[in-house]
């Protein structure tokens, strides 16, 4: 009931799950919807999946009690296969302990595409938004075939298009701007830290 109400109140939340420590990290409760705003479903026990092989399970299991883990932004997968149409998500999870022992975790999948599209609409309409992860892999690109291409074996990165951005991502400079002869900004690049340590 609590998980269902959480999805009702947060339209961008796609899944709320309790994943146990036992049985290869099997989901014990999963409430989900296919897309933001779509109908909410409670998954039948026969369709619950083991998740111990996923990065977010291992990272969350290793955290201290009460410490939130934020996953990389990637495409949602079901049974190990990228879901179609593509569904970019970020996962927030927290471990559950009892008497000092790890018992499982609560995991929330959040649809991140609406946030990307909002960012693309703010500011000057003539600007084009590119978003990457820390490796320079595209999360959002004007050519949609390059967005999340790394999830399907693609190797095209921001360094291919804008080599100077490497100095921002490796931390050697805080930001990069390229100006035209008339002083107009042609390219602006900045790292925005986002992870569990940025939650305060």
What are these regions (language model features)?
Residues 8-34, 51, 62-69, 120-140, ...:
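Short N-terminal helix-loop-first-beta-strand/juxtamembrane motif that initiates sensory/input modules
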Residues 101, 155-200:
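Extracellular/periplasmic juxtamembrane segments that couple receptor/chemosensory ectodomains to their
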Residues 12, 85-90, 125, 183:
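Exposed loop/turn and edge beta-strand positions of beta-sandwich/beta-sheet ligand-binding modules
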Residues 2-9, 43, 79, 101, ...:
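Solvent-exposed, extracytoplasmic
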Residues 33-36, 145-148, 195:
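Short, surface-exposed beta-strand-loop junctions and turns on beta-sheet-rich folds
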Residues 19, 95-97, 132, 193-196:
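Core beta-strand residues in small-molecule sensory/regulatory alpha/beta domains
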Residues 33-110, 117-118:
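Extracytoplasmic/periplasmic ligand-binding sensor regions of membrane-associated signaling proteins
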Residues 1, 48, 52, 167-168:
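Soluble or luminal CAZymes and related metallo-dependent hydrolases
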């Amino acid at each position: 009931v609590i998980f269902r109400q959480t999805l009702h109140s947060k339209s961008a939340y796609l899944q709320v799950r309790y994943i146990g420590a036992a049985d290869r990290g099997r989901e014990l409760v999963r409430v989900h919807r296919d897309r933001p705003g779509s109908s909410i479903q409670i998954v039948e026990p026969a369709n619950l999946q083991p998740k111990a092989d996923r990065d977010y399970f291992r990272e969350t299991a290793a955290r201290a009690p009460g410490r939130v883990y934020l996953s990389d932004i990637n495409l949602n997968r079901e049974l190990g296969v990228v879901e179609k149409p593509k569904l970019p998500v970020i996962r927030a999870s927290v471990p559950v302990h009892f008497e000092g022992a790890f018992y499982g975790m609560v995991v929330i999948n959040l649809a991140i595409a609406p946030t990307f599209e909002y960012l693309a609409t703010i500011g000057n309409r003539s600007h084009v938004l590119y978003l990457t992860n820390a490796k320079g892999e595209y999360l959002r690109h004007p050519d949609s075939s390059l967005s999340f291409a790394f999830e399907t074996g693609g190797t095209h990165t921001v360094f291919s298009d804008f080599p100077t951005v490497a100095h921002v991502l490796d931390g050697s400079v805080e930001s990069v701007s390229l100006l035209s002869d008339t002083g107009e900004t042609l390219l602006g690049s900045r790292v925005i830290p986002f992870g569990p340590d940025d939650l305060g």
